[in-house]
Amino acid sequence: MANLPDKDKLLRNFSRCGNWEEKYLYIIELGGQLPPLSAEMRTPDNRIAGCQSQVWIVLSTQADGSVQLYGDSDAAIVKGLIAMVFILYQGLTLAEIVAYDVRPFFDALALTQHLTPSRSQGLEAMVRGIRAQVAARQ
């Protein structure tokens, strides 16, 4: 996985941003830390429906049972939101992802109140898409 901060560090870094312009820049910076997604992974099966931007998320299960996520978007802020979702799920197993409710974390960041409705819907679509991929593997 990319060199992304853990959940606690993400919260700390986010709270250090002085205003929402800085927070958006931080979100974009997080997206820039995601490794490039290969053309082979940009398939219709990996495309997340319900996002205005093009979003691809690929899930692979590691030998230890944890999940590795790969993703990309054609929009910088959306790519940053992908990175934020990946931070929440990194190192979790399939069962842990299904059980984990990400909404309180996003509420703690006040994220959904500051995203456009289409980006908020896209964020929900990403979470649903990951959960659907997890359900297909269980």
Curated annotation (Swiss-Prot):
Originating organism: Sodalis glossinidius (strain morsitans)
Major site of localization recorded for this protein: cytoplasm
PANTHER family: CYSTEINE DESULFURATION PROTEIN SUFE (PTHR43597:SF3), SULFUR ACCEPTOR PROTEIN CSDE (PTHR43597)
The protein's name in its UniProt record: Cysteine desulfuration protein SufE
Function in brief: Participates in cysteine desulfuration mediated by SufS. Cysteine desulfuration mobilizes sulfur from L-cysteine to yield L-alanine and constitutes an essential step in sulfur metabolism for biosynthesis of a variety of sulfur-containing biomolecules. Functions as a sulfur acceptor for SufS, by mediating the direct transfer of the sulfur atom from the S-sulfanylcysteine of SufS, an intermediate product of cysteine desulfuration process.
GO biological process terms held by the UniProt record: iron-sulfur cluster assembly; sulfur compound metabolic process
Family from the record: Belongs to the SufE family.
Active site per UniProt: 51
Domain of life: Bacteria
InterPro entries reported for this sequence: Cysteine_desulfuration_SufE (IPR023939), Fe-S_metab-assoc_dom (IPR003808)
Pathway assigned in UniProt: Cofactor biosynthesis; iron-sulfur cluster biosynthesis
Pfam families attached to this UniProt entry: SufE
GO CC term (a single one): cytoplasm
Subunit and interaction comment: Homodimer. Interacts with SufS.
Protein location: Cytoplasm
UniProtKB keywords: Cytoplasm
